[in-house]
């Protein structure tokens, strides 16, 4: 039993100054976590019990699915990550260190290489497969902007598992087993979630899906078609456009366009100057970026913004992507800021990419590469070409579903799980083969499956909290019942302690507020803040033979006869 008189717990009345989201604010105020440094947190007893309950559920579901648990170190040698090129690919996100002999190590962001090498060292035959193994381990990523408390930290805990199969059919079966186990786990955790198509990113591989917990302050944006059920992270949203079927435009012409710093001002000038009725969608934005130190231009319609996350996810191999800065323009004197067009990109040393909406044959109003001048009838395929099409424009609510063309809705969420079909990338790089039935060496195909264990604590808090505090589901709460001794009489404290012991003997986990130096009002506020699902108040009504029972999630309260309190409480909880 937890007793608040001796518990390492100090609740706070004020929000932490750096709290941006409800979970961060409430987990700190309720004494669940404490900040050590940017993106690094310590777990206090209530927080760690909650975390361990989540870990327990995940472990049970992994074990029940037939997956075997292992454990790797957090500090890993450089060499395996060089073999897969991830020592370079991870860039500044990787924590790197040297030992006293000058050997390079890293703090593991993920453990694909270690899992692959373990299986390589132990197994050599197709008879050893399929195999699925997992670990629950601390990960490290040097996030440029750690934020939102434990949602995006530099140190965090993940469950990562990997499947090993002889062929693609086996990989698909292993992938589906993990997918089903995840659905079961997230349902047990009481999370609302959507499964959406996603990009594989630095992990590599082909098929990829994310498990997203809807949350207004979530960092991930996804699209959902309420008609056909299509769902995808915005990075994976595919733009479907029809080919251009209009007339061939006349040769492009340059016109004066002073004082047009915005798309709206350009549209207003063109409509007045040429008697046209165009909109921002008829103009072409040329967004200049530096991609791994090389200048590129991304073309999108003028009524759309460029989504850098979409560009980065869809430009293969690019590690660092940023907008042009003044010093970049200085290196390319042929680029006139605010008047850039794609017509002379090759001469200027710029590689051009286009959003799929910039179809071949379409014509646009865009910069003329001269100060205070634009051009119209600039036509894709005639006046400029592009290196490739890339999903670049922001996705908007109402865009057509790529499956059924119904307008999609957009929501925000927290990523709580991600599953990948990695294929043979890591096995090939690290030489993981087994002999098949014919004695021929075959490269093993792999799947990767992750759950953010520490992040799940925050995701559940985000979805279940209310205006007065945390509100945990029973299976993950640090205790199931919070017994509050609300008064000064010894009889109240004696009855509360006895009741708590009986409830615990009945199989419930109990938090007893037996503090004698805290007022009933303070205890009630702490109970609401801490968020235990069932609250029992032993107070002044005890003199009349009653105690009060509250359901935190419903905000309901009822009185029970003190003599029958244990049976009444058990019946109410298990009803």
Outline where the language-model segments fall.
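NTP/phosphate- and nucleic-acid-binding module
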Residues: 1-575
């Amino acid at each position: 039993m937890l007793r608040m008189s001796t518990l390492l717990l100090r609740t706070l009345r004020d929000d932490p100054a750096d709290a941006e989201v409800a979970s961060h604010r409430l987990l700190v105020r309720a004494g669940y976590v404490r900040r050590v440094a940017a993106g690094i947190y310590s777990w206090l007893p209530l927080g760690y019990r909650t975390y361990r309950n989540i870990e327990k559920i995940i472990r049970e579901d992994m074990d029940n699915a037939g997956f075997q648990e292992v454990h790797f170190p957090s500090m890993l040698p450089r060499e395996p990550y060089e073999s897969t090129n991830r020592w370079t690919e991870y860039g500044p996100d990787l924590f790197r260190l040297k030992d006293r002999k000058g050997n390079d190590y890293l703090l593991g962001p993920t453990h694909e290489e270690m899992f692959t090498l373990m299986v390589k060292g132990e197994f050599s035959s197709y008879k050893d497969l399929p195999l699925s193994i997992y670990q629950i381990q601390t990960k490290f990523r040097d996030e440029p902007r750690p934020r939102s408390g434990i949602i995006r930290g530099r140190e965090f805990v993940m469950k990562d598992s990997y499947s090993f199969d002889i062929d693609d059919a086996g990989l698909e079966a292993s992938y589906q087993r993990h997918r089903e186990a995840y659905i079961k786990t997230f349902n047990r955790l009481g999370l609302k979630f959507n499964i959406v198509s996603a990009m594989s990113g630095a992990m590599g591989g082909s098929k990829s899906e994310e498990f997203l917990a809807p949350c207004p302050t979530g960092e991930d944006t996804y699209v959902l078609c309420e008609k056909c059920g299509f769902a995808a992270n915005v990075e994976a949203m595919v733009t479907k456009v029809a080919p251009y079927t209009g007339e061939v435009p006349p040769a492009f012409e340059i016109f004066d366009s002073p004082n047009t710093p915005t798309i709206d001002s350009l549209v207003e000038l063109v409509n007045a100057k040429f008697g046209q009725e165009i909109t921002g969608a008829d103009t072409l934005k040329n967004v200049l970026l530096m991609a791994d130190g090389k200048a590129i231009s991304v073309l999108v319609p003028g009524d759309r913004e460029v989504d850098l996350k979409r560009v980065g996810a869809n430009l293969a191999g690019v590690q660092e992507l940023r907008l042009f800065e003044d010093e970049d323009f200085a290196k390319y004197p042929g680029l006139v800021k605010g008047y850039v067009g794609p017509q002379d990109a090759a001469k200027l040393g710029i590689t051009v990419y286009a959003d799929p909406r910039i179809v071949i044959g379409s014509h646009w109003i865009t910069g003329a590469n001269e100060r205070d001048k634009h051009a119209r009838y600039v036509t894709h395929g005639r006046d400029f070409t592009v290196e490739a099409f890339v999903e670049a424009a922001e996705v908007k609510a109402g865009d057509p579903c790529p499956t059924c063309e119904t307008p999609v809705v957009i929501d925000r969420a927290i990523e709580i799980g991600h599953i990948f079909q990695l294929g043979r990338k890591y096995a090939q790089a690290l030489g993981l083969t087994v002999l098949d039935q014919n004695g021929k060496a075959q490269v093993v195909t792999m799947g990767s499956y992750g759950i953010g264990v520490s992040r799940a604590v925050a995701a559940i808090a985000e979805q279940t909290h209310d205006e007065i505090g945390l509100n945990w589901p029973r299976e993950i709460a640090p205790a199931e019942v919070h017994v509050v001794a609300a008064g000064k009489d010894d009889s109240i404290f004696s009855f509360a302690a006895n009741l708590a012991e009986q409830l615990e003997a009945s199989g419930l986990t109990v938090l007893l507020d037996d503090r004698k130096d805290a007022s009933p009002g303070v205890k009630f506020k702490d109970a609401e803040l801490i968020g235990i699902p069932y609250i029992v108040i032993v107070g002044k009504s005890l003199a009349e033979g009653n105690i009060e029972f509250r359901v935190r999630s419903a905000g309901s309260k009822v009185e029970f006869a003190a003599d029958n309190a244990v049976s009444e409480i058990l019946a109410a909880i298990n009803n």
